[in-house]
């Protein structure tokens, strides 16, 4: 079975938000990696910030975004007490794409084994914005971006615009 073809190249405006109590713009390797991979794929990065792992900061950042098609959060998806990104984002999503988390954990399992069960990576739609939430690990970010997000970003945004 072949996927149906897309209409052609579209402009995709992205935001990158790192959720961390310890990272700075100098030490945020995963946030920088996401931006670089987006730019290498000819995707615009219109917004980048680092916020604390506080549910109110996470939800207010998502609610305040304008003129953004895709937002990629990284950090705070595990099960430690301060890992609140999943819960904050999941509470706002209008629709979820469970296949993203399922495939991400499957691909992670191939690389790191059973520790993949601790990941709460998620994807969904909030007010017509495609939202991804990834672990803070640069290896996890690279895996998600290269194998899942970048190959499908244009198609998913096209679906939201249809």
Indicate where each model-derived feature is located.
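Non-catalytic beta/alpha edge segments that cap or flank active sites
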Residues: 1-162
């Amino acid at each position: 079975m072949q996927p149906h073809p897309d209409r052609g190249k579209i402009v995709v405006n992205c935001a990158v938000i790192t959720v961390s109590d310890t990272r700075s713009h100098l030490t945020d390797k995963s946030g920088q990696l996401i931006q670089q991979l987006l730019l290498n794929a000819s995707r615009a990065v219109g917004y980048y910030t680092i916020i604390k792992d506080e549910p109110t900061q996470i939800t207010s950042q998502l609610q305040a975004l304008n003129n953004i098609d895709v937002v990629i959060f990284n950090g705070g998806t595990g099960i430690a007490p301060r890992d609140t990104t999943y819960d904050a984002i999941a509470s706002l999503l209008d629709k979820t794409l469970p296949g993203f988390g399922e495939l991400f954990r499957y691909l992670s399992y191939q690389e790191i084994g059973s520790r993949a069960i601790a990941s709460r990576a998620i994807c969904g739609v909030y007010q017509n914005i495609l939202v991804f939430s990834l672990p803070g690990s640069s290896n996890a970010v690279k895996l998600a971006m290269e194998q899942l997000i970048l190959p499908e970003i244009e198609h998913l945004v096209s679906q939201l615009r249809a």
